[in-house]
Amino acid sequence: MKKLQGAHLRKPVTPDLLMTPSDQGDVDLDVDFAAHRGNWTGKLDFLLSCIGYCVGLGNVWRFPYRAYTNGGGAFLVPYFLMLAICGIPLFFLELSLGQFSSLGPLAVWKISPLFKGAGAAMLLIVGLVAIYYNMIIAYVLFYLFASLTSDLPWEHCGNWWNTELCLEHRVSKDGNGALPLNLTCTVSPSEEYWSRYVLHIQGSQGIGSPGEIRWNLCLCLLLAWVIVFLCILKGVKSSGKVVYFTATFPYLILLMLLVRGVTLPGAWKGIQFYLTPQFHHLLSSKVWIEAALQIFYSLGVGFGGLLTFASYNTFHQNIYRDTFIVTLGNAITSILAGFAIFSVLGYMSQELGVPVDQVAKAGPGLAFVVYPQAMTMLPLSPFWSFLFFFMLLTLGLDSQFAFLETIVTAVTDEFPYYLRPKKAVFSGLICVAMYLMGLILTTDGGMYWLVLLDDYSASFGLMVVVITTCLAVTRVYGIQRFCRDIHMMLGFKPGLYFRACWLFLSPATLLALMVYSIVKYQPSEYGSYRFPPWAELLGILMGLLSCLMIPAGMLVAVLREEGSLWERLQQASRPAMDWGPSLEENRTGMYVATLAGSQSPKPLMVHMRKYGGITSFENTAIEVDREIAEEEESMM
């Protein structure tokens, strides 16, 4: 193949014999709507949005705990290896799909309509996650407001929500040093504040009897949705500006917490506990699985957020560079967050006279119990508490922007003539609907429903979606064709590393993750509460529903075609006639035009050699010889 460096930036010459006036009208209409779809106002908008999307709550409350329980510093070996095998390639693949087509998670499956069900599965998953994720933001807002006092309300016992088991955990000392406390039969004020005041979980008998709605949580959830709506009101035009603050300010707060943490007595004890390498853990398959899971969920692959953000890029945005900036930045942020968390936990363990592993927790237990308790031991505790929860707020909002933008973009791209002019109204309706669906999370037993959603909404179903996407693009659409599409955008083809990962390593890793999660399946639980069988069944069905959308989409695509079953499968697997770059100026090479005069017009790349004695197709951008054309035809 002859490569013309930089030529892809010029507008192609469209042969008149290949386009009818009606076709030209359609193209103009498409270009008009592509222009109205909008783009980021600057390249930094996209980069910061991706950073904000990936760097979320999991970096603070999941990575540090996973690191210290899976070998400390040795955990970084499988972590970065899985980042290279799975994280970076899948991240780049999703960005490439979105930027090349300028389409959301549903319409992007013009690449192969047979797999459009994977896009619907993405929307189901991201919708369920968005419902409970905003409830977590509501909890953060609750604690943020509670920090605006001279004394933190979870600092002491003696409040109406405390029980006889409440004990202010302060170390006892004698002349020879600290005497460790027996914490087995006691409960900290911060834990009772979280469970008995914020959640009021004692008012529920379980997931089947959620109890009453908590008006304070209900208002916090409403505020969270109002904030999200105002920030996505004008799509990426507004959210792209908000992230200049929400994606950068957390780093300032994290730095302040880190500096404060490492200067506390006992801090290095916690850091040593966090990073001391235990290389024998590397012999355990569990450690490698945990590393892959952390990478998979941390980068947000498969939720559609990356694809959506990239769809608003200009056609030649350097997403190759952006991929490495975001993925490596996400990893470094996770490690730094571990220093900030464990330095404070080391100080806390020294103050309590207990080992670090007795105070370290993961998930909400770290954010809403352990760390708030540690804040009460610091001078100016309300100030540090406010900073911590404000950091969590900004981290959570960035991810929520992506979830909502994914849903809105996907649906408006499917019905652009009706919804795109009313995108703000549609966004508001989505927020209202999700707020109403999330009200059950504000009840006394709302935490049980949140745990159920968290455990099943984005579990094995998400892995099935990503595996399907990877195989559909590389095996059905074709790895060579996909690499040439990337060449049109970036001026170079992905090398052997990306091809090997897309074809073999990434799908195999995800398949291993899915099998492991099924084999090691454990029923959901929250503390000592075990979920009833019907709740477990509901969760499993929730995960299966996203998987079933893929074969359901295949069935619909096949029924829309004509001919035998094999012919229908072939036709449904082929790219749609209008697949390719959205703007005419970027439709070069095989995408330069579609054939007219045929009873069933199909992409030019398939039929170019079959009409008018043309044996190759060429324009000012790319020249493709007879061998490549035959390869394209054989792929179909």
From Swiss-Prot:
GO molecular function, one term: L-proline transmembrane transporter activity
Broad class of where this protein is predominantly found: membrane
Catalysis: reaction(s): L-proline(out) + chloride(out) + 2 Na(+)(out) = L-proline(in) + chloride(in) + 2 Na(+)(in); L-pipecolate(out) + chloride(out) + 2 Na(+)(out) = L-pipecolate(in) + chloride(in) + 2 Na(+)(in)
Bilayer topology term: Multi-pass membrane protein
GO CC term, one of those recorded: membrane
Tissue: Brain specific (at protein level). Highly expressed in hippocampus, corpus striatum and temporal cortex. Also expressed in frontal cortex, occipital cortex and, at lower levels, in cerebellum and parietal cortex (at protein level).
Record field: transmembrane: 46-66, 74-93, 117-137, 215-233, 242-259, 295-312, 324-345, 378-397, 425-443, 459-479, 500-519, 538-556
Cytoplasmic side: 1-45, 557-636
InterPro entries named among the record's database cross-references: Na/ntran_symport, SNS_sf
Keyword Transport: yes
Keywords, comma-separated and alphabetical: Amino-acid transport, Cell membrane, Glycoprotein, Membrane, Neurotransmitter transport, Phosphoprotein, Symport, Synapse, Transmembrane, Transmembrane helix, Transport
Residue positions where Phosphotyrosine is found in the record: 591
Extracellular compartment segments: 138-214
Keyword Glycoprotein: yes
Glycosylation sites: 182
Residues with the Phosphoserine modification: 22, 573, 582, 598, 600
Phosphothreonine found at: 20, 588
Compartments (UniProt record): Synaptic cell membrane
Any one GO BP annotation for this protein: neurotransmitter transport
Function: Brain specific sodium (and chloride)-dependent proline transporter. Terminates the action of proline by its high affinity sodium-dependent reuptake into presynaptic terminals.
UniProt similarity note: Belongs to the sodium:neurotransmitter symporter (SNF) (TC 2.A.22) family. SLC6A7 subfamily.
PANTHER family named in the record: SODIUM-DEPENDENT PROLINE TRANSPORTER (PTHR11616:SF231), SODIUM/CHLORIDE DEPENDENT TRANSPORTER (PTHR11616)
Listed name of the protein: Sodium-dependent proline transporter
Organism (species): Homo sapiens
Lineage of the species this protein comes from: Eukaryota, Metazoa, Chordata, Craniata, Vertebrata
